[in-house]
Amino acid sequence: MTAIFNFESLLFVILLTICTCTYLHRQFPALLEKRKEGVTMVFWKCARIGERASPYISLFCVFMALRFIFGSS
């Protein structure tokens, strides 16, 4: 089943996108700063969400990791 139709997988993909964009913005600030328009604006917004909601994103990462390790089937 694709990540679009499975809610848990969709949340996992969104979380990974936020974490990746935040990491890239920390390592290469100019990479996302000049791309605030168009389709790439989504990645800039994900980086902002990751920076501003960092404790909540971290807790959600831990929760999803435990859920992935121990399974929920």
Swiss-Prot record:
GO biological process assignments: intracellular transport; protein secretion; vesicle-mediated transport
Record's subcellular location: Golgi apparatus membrane; Endoplasmic reticulum membrane
Residue spans crossing the bilayer: 53-73
Phenotype seen when the gene is deleted: Inviable.
Lumenal side of membrane: 22-52
Main subcellular location: Golgi
InterPro entries: KISH_domain, Ksh1
Protein topology in the membrane: Single-pass type I membrane protein
Signal peptide boundaries: 1-21
GO cellular component: endoplasmic reticulum membrane; Golgi membrane
Family membership: Belongs to the KISH family.
Name this protein carries in UniProt: Protein kish
Organism encoding this protein: Schizosaccharomyces pombe (strain 972 / ATCC 24843)
Gene: ksh1
